[in-house]
Amino acid sequence: MGFKRIRKKYTDKAVRMGWMMYDWANGAYLLVITTAIFPIFYNAVTTTEGADGSVSDSVTFLGWEFINTQLYSYVLGASFLIVILASPLLAGMADYLGRKLTFLKAFCYMGASGCIGLFWFDPQHLEWSMTALFLANVGAWGSLGFYNAFLPEIAPAEDHDLLSAKGYSWGFFGSIIILVLCLALIMGVGAHLTRWAFIFVGLWWAGWAQVTFRRMPVQVKDRPDGNLLWQGFRELKGVA
């Protein structure tokens, strides 16, 4: 059972540019949410000051009490663990089905939706709030695995390092632009608009990713026989 490759009607240069644009899109999350703005916001809204002037950084999650930074680390750690455990199997299934682009879209939209969901972050309802962060982080890092899997399809091996470096550069500049815009909003208008930065990042991520989705080559394959999960393990075993 072979693949049929559908090449979008773009030049190779345009296809490579489309690939690099996912760095431009995804980089906004990696800088604004994981590094620059959200950690400060999270610490501010989960720290309370008592009437006597005492400061508490304790939060309640699923009935358990945690230090706010401790819970933050646990949630991010759990999201990375899910990506580490699930990505190899999902990659095998995607290769077997010829659906890398579908998986890339799914993780992208999951991450962008989680990012937008942070707008409604509520320290009194951390179960929902931290779920949004969890989904955003799984989407961000999970999508990069499928994004990188396109590299051998759009460029020869000798161009991979250069193309990856260019993609990283695009991601860096894109993330700086959205960070400056968000900081201009927060510092120029007011800190009460910080939450809007999370919506802007989610829309930026999902919006610019459309360039990548339109330009990547598509592989389609006849519907496979047998158990899909088992076939995913077989593909993974073959790679290993």
PLM feature segments, named:
Residues 178-187, 202-221:
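C-terminal membrane-cytosol helix-exit motif in multi-pass small-molecule transporters
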Residues 2-17, 218-240:
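Juxtamembrane intracellular "pre-TM" segments in multi-pass secondary transporters
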Residues 107-121, 125-143:
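Hydrophobic core of transmembrane alpha-helices in multi-pass small-molecule transporters
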Residues 85-122:
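Conserved MFS/SLC helix-loop-helix module at the cytosolic interface between two early adjacent transmembrane helices
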Residues 6-80, 126-130:
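Helix-loop boundary and gating motifs at the non-cytosolic
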Residues 132, 136-169:
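Cytoplasmic helix-loop-helix junction between adjacent transmembrane helices
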Residues 61-68, 183-203:
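A membrane-interface helix-boundary motif in multi-pass transporters
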Residues 161-186:
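Glycine-rich segments within core transmembrane alpha-helices of 12-TM secondary carriers
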